[in-house]
Swiss-Prot record:
This is Omega-conotoxin SO-3. Negative results: has no effect on R-type calcium currents, voltage-gated sodium currents, delayed rectifier potassium currents and transient outward potassium currents. InterPro entries: Conotoxin (IPR004214), Conotoxin_omega-typ_CS (IPR012321). Omega-conotoxins act at presynaptic membranes, they bind and block voltage-gated calcium channels (Cav). This peptide selectively targets Cav2.2/CACNA1B (IC(50)=160 nM) voltage-gated calcium channels. When tested in mammals, this toxin displays an analgesic potency similar to MVIIA in a range of acute and chronic pain models in rodents, but has less adverse effects (tremor, diminution of spontaneous locomotor activity and bad coordinated locomotion) compared with identical dosages of MVIIA injected intrathecally. The modification Cysteine amide is found at residue 70. Keywords: Amidation, Calcium channel impairing toxin, Disulfide bond, Ion channel impairing toxin, Knottin, Neurotoxin, Presynaptic neurotoxin, Secreted, Signal, Toxin, Voltage-gated calcium channel impairing toxin.
Length: 71
């Protein structure tokens, strides 16, 4: 019985620590869009500025497809 109570208290304590840590780090990541664009360009083959592109198959390294060309 005592061991069960100790395990329950330990799990609750660890869960509380996880939630506090997650709440503390919210909003501290800077340059989120820059990081995601860099990740995208590293993980997929993308087209350079001025190359033809499709808005359906989004594949520009610059992050925008305007008038059928990467910009």
């Amino acid at each position: 019985m005592k061991l069960t109570c100790m395990v329950i208290v330990a799990v609750l304590l660890l869960t509380a620590c996880q939630l506090i840590t997650a709440d503390d780090s919210r909003g501290t990541q800077k340059h989120r869009t820059l990081r995601s664009k860099t990740k995208l360009s590293m993980s997929t083959r993308c087209k350079a500025a001025g190359k033809p592109c499709s808005r359906i198959a989004y594949n520009c390294c610059t992050g925008s497809c305007r008038s059928g060309k990467c910009g």
